[in-house]
C-alpha cells in the first residue's frame, strides 16, 4: 500500500474531492484508509455506560486507497509514490520531486 498512518493525503475523487487530511488508519487487507475530516458519516448510538446520552455521532468512514494521493513534502502538491532501495531498505519516494517519504 502506498500510504501509511500519519501521511498527509488529498482526496482525488468522490464527494470530498480536493480535501486534504492526515491518514488516521490504514487497512492494507481491505485496501482502505481513514482520513481525518473526510467522508464523515452520522452514526446513531444507543445510550450506554460510556455515553449515557446516546444520540448521533459524526465520524470518519473508510475510503478506498485508490481515491487518495500523497502530498509531496517539497512542493505541497499531490504526487504518485514510487519505491527505491537505499542501503538494502525499500524506501518510498515522491515521483514529482524525488524526495524520500520515509525517514
From Swiss-Prot:
<dbReference type="InterPro" id="IPR005824">
    <property type="entry name" value="KOW"/>
</dbReference>
<dbReference type="InterPro" id="IPR041988">
    <property type="entry name" value="Ribosomal_uL24_KOW"/>
</dbReference>
<keyword id="KW-0699">rRNA-binding</keyword>
<dbReference type="GO" id="GO:0003735">
    <property type="term" value="F:structural constituent of ribosome"/>
</dbReference>
<comment type="function">
    <text>One of the proteins that surrounds the polypeptide exit tunnel on the outside of the subunit.</text>
</comment>
<comment type="function">
    <text>One of two assembly initiator proteins, it binds directly to the 5'-end of the 23S rRNA, where it nucleates assembly of the 50S subunit.</text>
</comment>
<dbReference type="Pfam" id="PF17136">
    <property type="entry name" value="ribosomal_L24"/>
</dbReference>
<dbReference type="GO" id="GO:0019843">
    <property type="term" value="F:rRNA binding"/>
</dbReference>
<dbReference type="Pfam" id="PF00467">
    <property type="entry name" value="KOW"/>
</dbReference>
<dbReference type="InterPro" id="IPR008991">
    <property type="entry name" value="Translation_prot_SH3-like_sf"/>
</dbReference>
<protein>
    <recommendedName>
        <fullName>Large ribosomal subunit protein uL24</fullName>
    </recommendedName>
</protein>
<comment type="subunit">
    <text>Part of the 50S ribosomal subunit.</text>
</comment>
<dbReference type="InterPro" id="IPR014722">
    <property type="entry name" value="Rib_uL2_dom2"/>
</dbReference>
<dbReference type="GO" id="GO:0005840">
    <property type="term" value="C:ribosome"/>
</dbReference>
<dbReference type="InterPro" id="IPR005825">
    <property type="entry name" value="Ribosomal_uL24_CS"/>
</dbReference>
<dbReference type="GO" id="GO:0006412">
    <property type="term" value="P:translation"/>
</dbReference>
<dbReference type="InterPro" id="IPR003256">
    <property type="entry name" value="Ribosomal_uL24"/>
</dbReference>
<comment type="similarity">
    <text>Belongs to the universal ribosomal protein uL24 family.</text>
</comment>
<keyword id="KW-0687">Ribonucleoprotein</keyword>
<dbReference type="GO" id="GO:1990904">
    <property type="term" value="C:ribonucleoprotein complex"/>
</dbReference>
<keyword id="KW-0694">RNA-binding</keyword>
<keyword id="KW-0689">Ribosomal protein</keyword>
Amino acid at each position: 500500500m502506498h500510504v501509511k498512518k500519519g501521511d498527509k493525503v488529498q482526496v482525488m475523487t468522490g464527494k470530498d474531492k480536493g480535501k486534504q487530511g492526515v491518514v488516521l488508519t490504514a487497512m492494507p487487507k481491505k485496501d482502505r484508509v481513514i482520513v481525518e475530516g473526510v467522508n464523515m458519516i452520522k452514526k446513531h448510538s444507543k445510550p450506554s455506560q460510556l455515553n449515557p446520552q446516546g444520540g448521533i455521532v459524526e465520524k470518519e468512514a473508510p475510503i478506498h486507497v485508490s481515491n487518495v494521493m500523497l502530498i509531496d513534502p517539497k512542493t505541497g502538491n499531490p504526487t504518485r509514490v514510487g519505491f527505491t532501495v537505499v542501503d538494502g531498505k525499500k524506501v518510498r519516494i515522491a515521483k514529482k520531486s524525488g524526495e524520500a517519504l520515509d525517514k
